[in-house]
Amino acid sequence: PPRLMAPPIHEAKHRVWLVTPYFVPGEAARMALTSAALGGLDVRLLVPRVSDSRLVTYAARSYFDELLEAGVRIYEYGPRMLHTKALLADDDVCIVGSANFDSRSFRLNFELSMLFRDQAVAAEMAGLIGTDLQQAQEVQFARHRPLWRSRLPEAFARLLSPLL
C-alpha cells in the first residue's frame, strides 16, 4: 500500500483527501501529506472522533499539530465508528481497500487496495467523502491542551506507534 498511495499524493495538483479509521503514519507518509499541504493543495484527513482503540486515537492525535501547522485540514467523524479506507487525489485518482494509513497495514498485515484512474469513480468518492465531512467536526489547532488529559497520553501512544 505505501507504494500504491505515495505516488498519487506526490503527483496531485489540487487535492488529496484521506479517510482512514486508524491514522498512525510513518515519517514518509507524514512528509507526503505535509509537503502536499505546504505546496498549496487542499489536503484533508478524515478520522473517527473515537476509535475502537483508545491507544490508536491518542497516537493519531499526536500527529495533528504537525499536520495542522502545515495546512492539512483534519476532521473527526462522530456519528459512529468510521471504517472507510480511501484516498482521493485530484479529480481522477481514487484508492479504496482494506489498508489503514498505518505502519501495521503497510508492513505487516495482508491488505488489498485498488487504484482507480477514473473521473466518474473519483467524483462518486468525492461525494461520499463530502457527505461524511459534513457530519464531522474540523479539528482546530490547540497548543494549550491539558498535559495530563491529552498531551501525555498522546506522547506515550506516539512512542508505541510503530507497533500499532
Give, region by region, the residue ranges found by the protein language model:
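PLD/PLD-like phosphodiesterase catalytic module centered on the HKD motif
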Residues: A12-L18, Y22-L164
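Active-site cores of enzymes that catalyze phosphoryl transfer or operate on phosphate-rich substrates
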Residues: P1-L4
